[in-house]
Amino acid sequence: MTGTVLQVSTSRGGIPKRALLSAELTAAGVVGDAWRYPFHGGPRKAILLVTSEGIEELVAQGFTLFAGALGENLTTRGLDRRTMYFGQRFRVGHATIELTLMRTPCATLDVYGGGIQAAMYDALVQAGDPASPVWGLSGFYASVIEPGTVSPGDEVALITPPSRRRRR
């Protein structure tokens, strides 16, 4: 599975995040990025990755979204959210990340339209079941395994075997 980095984003806290020309990914997250609440971030939530295809699905449902709107650090093109799962490692530009957790959407996202939380997160997602039709729409948290620079246009390549790993 391969894709492309569409946008790298940061903010001083909250949403939306704004596009950068490039960014350094570290174990602590994207250099210069900040979180609004202390329960955001940390080594297992260093990066939030959202697919542009997922954003487009939500836009088709009437939500006013764009790259960075969901608070993601990495917006990708060409990755199938339905086949992504925890434990997968991806080479992203010069960095390596590992998917760790599904993002649980909060009321902050309601600014983009009522019902957005339900449109991207259901009981199956909460249980870690990729059979959910909304699997991955809320985004995947990732830890940074190998720090490095990432820029729009960089390749995103799966580097772990395609077998399923345990869900968290």
Give the positions of each predicted feature.
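Metal-cofactor-dependent catalytic cores
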Residues: 1-168
